Amino acid sequence: MATQTLLPPGTESYDPRFESLILFNAELELLADGFRWLEGPVWFGDHQCLLFNDLPNNRTLRWSECHGVSVFRESSDYGNGQTRDHQGRLITCHHRSRCLNRGEHDGTTTTLVGQADGKALNAPNDVVVKSDGSIWFSDPLYGLINDYEGGRQLSEQPAALYRLDPATGELNRMASDFDGPNGLAFSPDERKLYVAESGAPGALEPRQYIRMFDVSEDGRSLSGGEIFHKITPGWADGFRVDEHGNLWCGAGDGVHCIAPDGTLLGKVLVPKRVSNLCFGDRFHSRLFICASTTLYALFTNTRGVQRP
């Protein structure tokens, strides 16, 4: 049961720890509206702007405090999840071409990977870069099942979680016991990897949980994979981790804040389903929220882990 606190309207606290993470005088802001389905928010501190994808409209958009929303890329190849590598380059998951691309500083694009074991990937969904430079991404079937998010295509292999070494091109399948791997993020010390399990496409009862894996000392293998937290209503989608190790996860009724021990601390209620989010702005403490057709933001009293 939610507790009564001095939190702003539109937030619910289930644990006293949540109150220190939220500002009493900062409410949810609507930044822009009128899109179709937003995904892949990533903050560019060097340009003080947010990039995000309007997936069905096949375009990448740019938002800044001074200029609002503009088109960054007119044809995004149905880009989904995004992040930056340690050189500041944009890494994007693409549905249409079923690959992972890197945007270079000179404006060109490099395809990092499009196959596993000689077969096409499904539809890379979300991505995170580890401190050693390795790129981890989820590859479910969601982007293959309709024309709305890239075009129907046949799957050539099971849904899986991958690790890519961009220096050598070595690709390793880290886990394949998923119905639908989705958002993913490392704990601040990178000893844990959290992965959303959203279930098989079209399932009548989608999976609603986040799994937690132990990362080996060399960062090249996983163990465990037990259920860390169950999301309700809706299902776990994109999420980020803050400096305290809390997960801020997109859900059916907004953003759920989950402690490292798996406890639901509180919720930021959002009028529309949240697909993805990221921390950004000057101190990396503003939460940018992609919610269906709308972009929201909320100033918080915590900071995202300082990683792309």
Where in this protein do the model-derived segments appear?
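Short loop/turn segments immediately following beta-strands, especially the blade-tip
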Residues: 212-220, 300-306
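Blade-edge beta-strand/turn elements of extracellular beta-propeller
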Residues: 18-30, 67-75, 106-120, 160-180, ...
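Beta-rich, blade/repeat-based domains predominating
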Residues: 33-48, 75-94, 98-99, 117-135, ...
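C-terminal closing repeat unit and adjoining cap/tail of repeat-based domains
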Residues: 18, 251-308
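A detector of repeated loop/turn-to-beta-strand junctions in beta-rich toroidal repeat architectures
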Residues: 57, 97, 151, 155-159, ...
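A short loop-to-beta-strand structural motif that recurs across blades of beta-propeller domains
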Residues: 59-61, 99-101, 160-162, 209-211, ...
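Blade/loop signatures of beta-propeller domains
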Residues: 1-27, 306-308
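Beta-propeller domains
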Residues: 20, 45-74
